[in-house]
Amino acid sequence: MGQVLPLVTRQGDRIAIVSGLRTPFARQATAFHGIPAVDLGKMVVGELLARSEIPAEVIEQLVFGQVVQMPEAPNIAREIVLGTGMNVHTDAYSVSRACATSFQAVANVAESLMAGTIRAGIAGGADSSSVLPIGVSKKLARVLVDVNKARTMSQRLKLFSRLRLRDLMPVPPAVAEYSTGLRMGDTAEQMAKTYGITREQQDALAHRSHQRAAQAWSDGKLKEEVMTAFIPPYKQPLVEDNNIRGNSSLADYAKLRPAFDRKHGTVTAANSTPLTDGAAAVILMTESRAKELGLVPLGYLRSYAFTAIDVWQDMLFGPAWSTPLALERAGLTMSDLTLIDMHEAFAAQTLANIQLLGSERFACEVLGRAHATGEVDDSKFNVLGGSIAYGHPFAATGAWMITQTLHELRRRGGGFGLVTACAAGGLGAAMVLEAE
C-alpha cells in the first residue's frame, strides 16, 4: 500500500457532500431540444439551492463544466451564478475534462475547502447534444475575417468570389479525437478485439444496465435525486430519464448492426451510451460548516485520482489506471468497497476495464504494481444501472454518479463507494466516497 492522502482541512475537517441533484436525462433532440446547457445548469443549481434551503450567501464558490462549449456563454459557471439568484460576489469559474468534467469540478471545490479559502461550494456540469455550436468552414471563416477588414465593396466581392459551394456548408462539432482522428467508438472496437470482448457480452451488459435502471425508477430510488424539469412550452414536464428501455430484451440487441466497424465490429448503438442532454450538481462544504448549519451530509469525499495515458491505443482505460491510485490514497482495497460505479461509455470499454482491474499481468507489467487492483464483484457493480441506460450528458456524469452512489450507500447502511470514468484524450478519473 502506498501513501495515504487524507482529504481534510487544516482543522481536520472532512470534505462533506451535503446534497446532490440532477435533471432527468434526455436523448438528443427530444425533451430538451433547443434548451442550451447553460439553461440546464441554471435549472439544476436553482432547484438544488431551493431544496437544500441553504442561504445563497453560504455558497462561496461555484465550479461548473461544459464539454460542448457555446461561444456566447464561455464561462457557464458565472452565468449560472447570475441566473439563479445567487450572491453576485460568488466566485465562479468553468472547467473541462471531457467526460470527467464534473469529477474535476468536485476536486477543485474540495481543494478550495482544504486550502481554507472557502467553507462551502457547488460543483457540477451540464451539456446539451441538441444545442450545438455549428461552425463554418475554415476557408469561409478566413474570408469573413478579411471581409470585415476590407474597405470597399469591390474588395469584399473579390473575397467572396474565392468561395465555392462546399465552403458554405455548416460544420458540426468534431466527434473524433483532435490528435488522432479516431472516434471513441473506434477505440472501443479496438479494445473489444484486443481483449476478446464478444458482442454477446456487450449486449448482456447493456441489457443489465437498462433492467437495473428501470427497476431503480420503479422502486422509487431516484425520486429524491432527480428533479422534475419544466421546459417550454410548459405543457408536459419531464419527470424521468427518457432513454431507459423498460422492456429491454436481449433479442432486440442482437438485431442491430455495428456502428463503427461495419463489417467485423461488435460495438452498436444499443451497447453504447447515447448522446444526451442534462445537468447535475452537488453541494460540498467542510464537515464543521455542515454541523453549524444543522445539515446531515450524504457522505464524504475520501480520495480522488486523475490519470492520463496514450491516445493511440486503449485510450478508454482511465478506470483501470485511476482506480488503484484513488484506492491507495484512501487507504483501501477493492474488497473494502460496498459499491463500484463505473461510467459505461461503451459496454466494450467497461468490460475491458473490469478485466484489467483483475489482471496481475497488467498490474505488474504496465502499472508497475505488485498485485492486481482486484476483481470486480458483480453484486457491487453498477447496481442501479449505468450510462448506457441513463445516458451521458458529458459534463454532468460525474456529479450524477457521485450523488447516486452516496444515496445507495446510505440505503445500505453506509460504507465506501468507488466512482470512476474514462474520458477523451486518454484521461481517467476515480473517486472514493464514504457514507455513514
From Swiss-Prot:
The keyword Cytoplasm applies. GO terms for cellular component: cytosol. Pathway: Lipid metabolism; fatty acid beta-oxidation. It is an enzyme of class 2 (transferase). It comes from the Bacteria. It is found in: Cytoplasm. Its main location: cytoplasm. It catalyses: an acyl-CoA + acetyl-CoA = a 3-oxoacyl-CoA + CoA. GO terms for biological process: fatty acid beta-oxidation. Pfam families: Thiolase_C, Thiolase_N. Keywords: Acyltransferase, Cytoplasm, Fatty acid metabolism, Lipid degradation, Lipid metabolism, Transferase. Catalyzes the final step of fatty acid oxidation in which acetyl-CoA is released and the CoA ester of a fatty acid two carbons shorter is formed. Heterotetramer of two alpha chains (FadJ) and two beta chains (FadI). PANTHER family: ACETYL-COA ACETYLTRANSFERASE, CYTOSOLIC, ACETYL-COA C-ACYLTRANSFERASE. Belongs to the thiolase-like superfamily. Thiolase family. This is 3-ketoacyl-CoA thiolase. The lineage of its organism: Bacteria, Pseudomonadati, Pseudomonadota, Gammaproteobacteria, Enterobacterales. The gene is fadI.
